[in-house]
A protein has these predicted regions:
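N-terminal Rossmann-like NAD(P) cofactor-binding module of classical short-chain dehydrogenase/reductase
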Residues: 100
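Cysteine-nucleophile active-site neighborhood
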Residues: 104-192, 200-201
Length: 294
């Protein structure tokens, strides 16, 4: 298969025949270069190098060294007047309207890094000042009182570490990983994000730790929240509701941000990718390969 081909495919045909002769296997197709906005691989993203410009609403994502599933926050970056900045040092944090703590491949190691970098102290100071704090998966675990690892699933030599103490919960790592699709309706949410009550959410969980005092989708209140659900901001109305809260606190109009359906946009982008792939590949041949008929 030839991927991301630019130009007239007819010009490429002689080369495809030569390739088949040299390799002794058929070319399954040619997929043209197409601009499709889909989620990046964690290690291949260009988002981390983007501008640190602060816009009408400013959101800071803490860029921990072992960051994962950072695309949880993509719904926020598709508003023209919202800046989503990835921050890995205190001097770049400033005073954002919301701080997001992402998932991580190692909660304990990245929690230690937060302490050593001074970012934990900066986050605690921001939380004390009323800034909205939201952690997802590993970032959620960091917000609790303790993270324990009695079986040393994550790190050898570490059985327990203090969390930030912003949420009334404790996390314990176990050998079996939680992997599940989840959906539901927000209820019982208190504090700044109480407007989420009644909205539907869906996503997935994939994590090693279990947290006591955990609500189904959203824990916390006041101005600090956390969730194990990846994709929690994608469903219609959720990102909008959070941004409306931030706008009201800042005294600016939500209309200046422009409404955006993240879930619908993502579906349209994947549909576009599927159409391009189907149009470029010999799909009957691909299916025969999948069924081991070739």
């Amino acid at each position: 298969m030839v991927n991301k081909f630019r130009g007239d495919r007819a010009i490429l045909e002689p080369g495809l025949k030569t390739l088949e002769q040299l390799c002794g296997i058929p070319v399954a197709g040619v997929i043209p270069y197409t601009h499709v906005d889909i989620d990046d691989e964690d290690s291949l993203t260009e988002r981390f190098g983007r501008s640190m410009e602060r816009k009408l609403l400013d959101i800071a994502v803490i860029r921990v060294p072992r960051i994962s599933n950072f695309t949880d926050f993509s719904p926020f970056e598709r508003y023209a007047n919202v800046s989503l900045r990835y921050v890995d040092q205190v001097s770049d944090l400033h005073q954002p309207d919301m701080i997001l703590l992402p998932g991580t491949k190692s909660t304990i190691a990245d929690l230690r890094w937060l302490r050593q970098s001074g970012l934990e102290a900066a986050i605690l100071k921001a939380a004390d000042a009323g800034t909205l704090i939201f952690g997802v998966c590993g970032g959620y675990q960091m917000l609790g009182r303790t993270v324990s690892d009695p079986e040393q699933v994550e790190a050898a030599g570490v059985t327990e570490i203090n969390g930030m103490g912003l949420l009334d919960m404790d996390t314990e790592f176990r050998g079996e990983k939680v992997q599940t699709q989840t959906q539901g309706i927000f209820h019982g949410v208190e504090g700044l994000l109480s407007a989420l009550n009644g909205l539907a959410y869906e996503g997935y969980e994939i994590h090693m730790g279990r947290s006591r005092q955990q609500m189904p989708a959203l824990s916390g209140g006041g101005n600090v929240y956390g969730s194990y659900v990846h994709g929690i901001f994608d469903a219609p109305g959720i990102a909008d509701t959070i941004l409306r809260v931030l706008c009201a606190r800042k005294g600016v109009s939500f209309d200046a941000l422009a409404t955006f359906d993240a879930s619908g946009y993502k579906e349209r982008q994947y549909d576009l990718l599927a159409d391009v792939v189907r149009g470029g590949l010999d799909m009957p041949f691909v299916y025969r390969v999948l069924h081991r008929e070739v």
